[in-house]
UniProtKB/Swiss-Prot annotation:
Gene name as annotated: glyA
Subcellular compartments: Cytoplasm
Classification via NCBIfam families: PRK00011.1
CDD domains from the UniProt entry: SHMT (cd00378)
Protein name in UniProt: Serine hydroxymethyltransferase
Pathway: Amino-acid biosynthesis; glycine biosynthesis; glycine from L-serine: step 1/1
Catalysed reaction, written as an equation: 5,10-methylenetetrahydromethanopterin + glycine + H2O = 5,6,7,8-tetrahydromethanopterin + L-serine
Any one biological process term the GO annotation gives: tetrahydrofolate interconversion
Chief site of localization: cytoplasm
Enzyme class, first EC level, given as a word: transferase
Highest taxon, organism lineage: Archaea
GO function term, MF aspect, one: glycine hydroxymethyltransferase activity
pH-dependent activity: Optimum pH is 8.1.
Primary role: Catalyzes the reversible interconversion of serine and glycine with tetrahydromethanopterin (H4MPT) serving as the one-carbon carrier. Cannot use tetrahydrofolate (THF or H4PteGlu) instead of H4MPT as the pteridine substrate. Also probably exhibits a pteridine-independent aldolase activity toward beta-hydroxyamino acids, producing glycine and aldehydes, via a retro-aldol mechanism.
């Protein structure tokens, strides 16, 4: 008979098995990353047990002496890294951060403009998620299919026509910078706020690459802190000082009661790492993405936007409809320890998200494991051998990845996937 304690050991073993599998895999999921041992240490701390409702110095709970200092430090580091007037580090996810900005700057029934999901927009920008929860009328940005980006000229005309309350940039399929500056004049004319969902590219922005939304005219830069930004899971809002009070109130008490204090500490540590190493890390991530795209293209894959050097972000996007079903291809790759995801492309039916034509790849995690351009040809070759040649490369991938088991771009040299066992 299985005892209750046996279940705890089963779960612990599954966690260990997961860590071992990730260490042996080429993880190319564009929305994931690994944290340093110092960030992991924060996540294991007593802060995970505590409550601190409200802002630092204005808590509704006692016992926050050190918690206040940690959050204040994290706020100051975030403002410094992104050169922002105000930062709120309490959102528990990127979607919660988006919702807070929606509540702070617009009302039910207001029109907004955002990317349609197959064009690259995040689900939280759509009627089925956060934007719909807020009750917005959602208009979509005109899209340039060839260049995989918003059509800037058509966008400006549509802003004047629709008069949106929020012009929302950013997305989850995100190869090139969005036309923030180009929207500014029209936004001012109709009284719209510009919001930039930088969840996927936050680490690139922090490193000084991709684009600089706050300098280009965005009122709010919002994102999750665990994709290209190598922190713990959570959200952040960076904004103009004039919006600070409304956004803070939308976060608490509006959407978050107690925020995750151990994640705030981890975010502060990750932000310090990015101040030190962010430029080098971001540049290498983008260089790796371009090189991987080039290698995949040379091997016969239909990698999008060859005429634009494929990408300016961490992402590489392929249309695999000419060689198979993306859903089946991604499963075959997973069986060979190559982890990525199927993805809707602009020409796909939004109702067929389970059977799209695209594959999305991200290079941020393998970059943090120490890979550079020279390794991208090997990664591409493994993908080709599975997808086009039908080979089993699982053992070869595990052997290949055994040389890349440590976290780079951090203050200490540590194992990336070590199971942190507490006795």
């Amino acid at each position: 008979m299985v005892s209750n304690q046996d279940y705890t050991e089963k779960i612990r073993q599954l966690m260990k098995d997961h860590n071992s599998w990730m260490e042996s895999s080429i993880n190319l999921i564009a929305s994931e990353n690994i944290t340093s041992s110092r960030v992991k240490e924060a996540l294991l701390s007593d802060l995970s047990h505590r409550y601190a409702e409200g802002l630092p110095g204005e808590r509704l709970y006692e016992g926050c002496r050190y918690i206040d200092e940690i959050e204040e430090l994290t706020i100051e580091l975030s403002k410094r890294l992104f050169r922002a007037e105000h930062a709120n580090v309490q959102p528990t996810s990127g979607v919660v951060a988006n919702l807070a900005c929606f509540f702070a700057t617009a009302e039910v029934g207001d029109p907004i403009m955002a990317m349609e999901v197959p064009y690259g927009g995040h689900i939280s920008h759509a009627r089925v998620s956060a934007a719909g929860v807020r009750g917005f009328q959602i208009y979509t940005h005109p899209f340039d299919f060839e260049n995989m980006n918003i059509d800037a000229d058509a966008m400006k005309k549509k802003i004047l026509e629709v008069k949106p309350r929020i012009i929302l940039f950013g997305g989850s399929l995100f190869l090139f910078p969005h036309p923030v500056e180009e929207a500014l004049e029209a936004a001012e004319e109709v009284g719209a706020r510009i919001m930039y969902d930088g969840a996927h590219v936050l680490g690139l922005i922090a490193g000084g690459y991709f684009q600089d939304p706050l300098r280009e005219g965005a009122d709010m830069l919002v994102g999750s802190t665990h994709k290209t930004f190598p922190g713990p899971q959570g959200g952040i809002i960076l904004c103009r000082e004039e919006l600070a009070a409304d956004i803070d109130e939308a976060v608490f008490p509006g959407l978050v009661s107690n925020h995750h204090l151990h994640h705030v500490a981890g975010l502060g540590i990750a932000t310090a790492e990015m101040l030190e190493f962010g430029a080098e890390y971001a540049a290498q991530t983008i260089n790796n993405a371009r090189k991987l795209a080039e290698n995949l293209h040379e091997l016969g894959f239909n990698v999008l936007c060859e005429h634009l050097d494929f990408t300016e972000s961490h992402q590489v996007v392929m249309d695999v409809s000419d060689i198979g079903r993306a859903a089946e291809i991604s499963k075959r790759l997973e069986a060979n320890n190559i982890i990525l995801n199927k993805n809707l492309l602009p020409w796909d039916d939004v109702n067929r998200s389970d059977d799209p034509s695209g594959i999305r790849i991200g290079t941020q995690e393998i970059t943090r494991r120490g890979m550079k351009e020279s390794e991208m040809s090997e990664v591409a070759e493994y993908i080709k051998r599975v997808v086009m040649d039908g080979k089993d490369v699982r053992d070869e991938v595990a052997e290949f990845m055994s040389s890349y088991t440590r976290v780079h771009y951090a203050f200490e040299d540590s194992e990336a996937y070590k199971y942190m066992e507490i006795q």
